[in-house]
């Protein structure tokens, strides 16, 4: 799986469009896997760090954080904003790495 920086280098136009969707609104929808394997959806904030990472923010003991510590796979759906979907839609999936 590519890092955000690798994605941006390989597909600059697409990564710019996705980044625009993710920075247009503060809150997005994160899907994680519960202990029993069923999906959990949660609101989350997304930040692009200075060193080119896509960071998913969470309180340390939030269920989404616990899910990601156990199974780091996730899907993220950008907030579509206004009902006209100006700017398109963005969905991505990946593997989270805990930052301490």
What is each model feature region?
Residues 1-27:
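Extreme N-terminal tail/first-helix region
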Residues 4-5, 60-100:
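Short, structured beta-strand-loop surface elements
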Residues 22-34, 75-78:
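A short, Trp-centered hydrophobic/proline-enriched beta-strand micro-motif
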Residues 34-36, 49:
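Short, acidic, Ser/Thr-enriched surface-loop or helix-capping motifs
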Residues 43-48:
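A short, well-structured catalytic beta-strand-centered motif of the EAL phosphodiesterase domain
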Residues 51-55:
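Short active-site oxyanion
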